[in-house]
Regions:
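Membrane/wall-proximal cationic-aromatic binding patches
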Residues: 199-253
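Transmembrane and membrane-interface helices of multi-pass
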Residues: 1-216
């Protein structure tokens, strides 16, 4: 996953190198170390389901585990690559990270097509297909292993390993054991917005933005009480127990 994120970041910077005319090479290189924490968090989130399947694979010998992991990896690659190339496509127009608002445009795909240059759109579609195919092939050839047949299996080994790895993945997800979880600000380091955008993990940002938006449920996040209750409080604040106006005229009308 780290290679996936780094390569995607390189592609993004190359596509929008025209927006970096006055930025030094060394400042651009700072993007990668500042991106590490969010990349680690995202990698842990994406790796969590595989930890479950690998643990089950060690406990139960079944050839179907590898098929499940291949399908799961393909689904993840499709989603994460779509987010990556979607951001590359709209960044020139939006100049901000891809957010949940992109899903609203899916209701009218013509707006998306009109926003992105035709040549760039074709390149992005080809790049998307090649990206997914390359990383799926890499996973199948290098990462995934043949079905494990436990020999001299210890009933204690798998649970302990699972607990240790689960704890490490949990720590990676939230960016450590500090009171405050990791956020986008962890990657900000430059006065150039595009470098900060490049450092923030695209997939982490999109998913966090989408989940945060769904929790709001189109409601006002600053509304702490009902309108009726607020009006009653205002009436009490402005109410006067007696008229304290100084009478200057004899006529009280």
């Amino acid at each position: 996953w780290f290679f996936f994120f780094i390569l995607g970041r390189v592609i993004f910077l190359l596509v929008y190198s025209n927006l970096l005319p006055d930025v030094s090479f060394w400042e651009i290189m700072k993007v990668f170390p500042h991106a590490f924490k969010l990349d680690l968090s995202t990698a842990c989130w994406l790796s969590a389901p595989f930890l479950v399947f690998i643990s089950l694979q060690y406990a139960i010998s079944w050839k179907g585990w590898n098929v499940i992991k291949k399908v799961l990896m393909l689904a993840m690659l499709l989603i994460t690559s779509m987010i990556l190339f979607g951001e590359i496509g709209v960044y020139d127009e939006w100049r901000v990270k891809l957010s949940h608002k992109a899903l609203l445009y899916l209701r009218n795909p013509k707006e998306i097509i009109d926003t992105v240059d035709t040549g760039l759109l074709v390149i992005l579609l080809i790049g998307f297909a090649v990206y997914v195919a390359a990383f799926q092939c890499l996973y199948c050839k290098v990462v995934i292993k043949p079905a494990v047949v436990p020999q001299r299996y210890s009933a204690l080994k798998s649970p302990i390993m699972f607990i240790v790895l689960a704890f490490l993945i949990f720590c990676g997800m939230r960016g450590g054991l500090k009171g405050v979880p990791i956020s986008q600000s962890q990657s900000f380091f430059s006065q150039h917005a595009i470098l900060n955008d490049a450092a923030v993990n695209t997939q982490w940002n999109f998913i966090f933005n989408y989940v945060h938006f769904k929790t709001l449920d189109n409601s006002n996040p600053f509304q702490e009480m009902s309108t009726e209750q607020a009006n009653d409080i205002l009436k009490d604040i402005y109410a006067t127990p007696q008229d304290t106006t100084i009478q200057v005229l004899n006529n009280s009308r």
